[in-house]
Amino acid sequence: MKMHKRLSQIAVALTVVSLAGTAAAANIVGAQSAGSGASTITVGESQVPFGPHTAGKAGVGISSYAAGIKVDFQGLTPSSAATELHPGTDKGMTVYQLHDPITTGTPGDPNNPAHAGLGSFNFVKVGTGDVWFGEWSTNGNTGSPTYQNRQVYYVGDKTGYTAATGTAVGYTLTGLHRYGANTHLTGSLTANFSSRTFHGDLSIGATQIRLGTSGSQIAFDTNGHFDAANAGQWVIPGNFVLKTGDVKGDFFGAQAATVAGIVDFGDQSMNIAWGGTKN
């Protein structure tokens, strides 16, 4: 009976997907690093309208589950363990952990189902809008090796975006890199909305992640989007650049209230997801 109900729900979701082309598309943007396993994730507009989930929001799908249909991140939060990151300094950054098999759900509660077989999610809500970043792997900080097939991502709703004003607009940043085995990264970003450029950095211990190579800036377009090849650096003590990576992301909200992105080093063990709120 439960399987029949689940199959019926999936059928409804597939119908929603097939009808999506006839409806106005939500303004959801995002990106993820490449996957390497049998299962991979893709971020984008959510398509599931039942249970705890809502269609048309920032979401994620797993290729090996229900044909990769995307569910919204907000709908995953009731089933997740929540931790506020350095409260009082980053305007409400909260990391949610949804882990298989740790997150068992509540039997009989359609708004808190079990998530067995869906892998391990660490994801962060940025500010008050529908903006998220995080990491996914098949096993998280368990097993050997840990964090298998790891991917990082960001996704959010661009509706209502307007540029900020000023040549030195500051943001407080948070980043994730194998959260659970490590703590979160912290940092800052300064954006010039006249020249549409920014630079920033994140750090954890003695490791620094530069957003913009030493002495250079990353450009963003009139819609607050950026995609800069080899513009990120993984820097270790001695100012040695261990690796460079692509920096992708977006500013979101009125007056560019938030920002989120990834640094894709082409190495699942090094890739970073990050985001922040305007100071």
Report each predicted region and the residues it spans.
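Mature soluble binding/inhibitory domains
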Residues: A25-N279
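Gram-negative bacterial Sec-dependent N-terminal signal peptides
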Residues: M1-A26
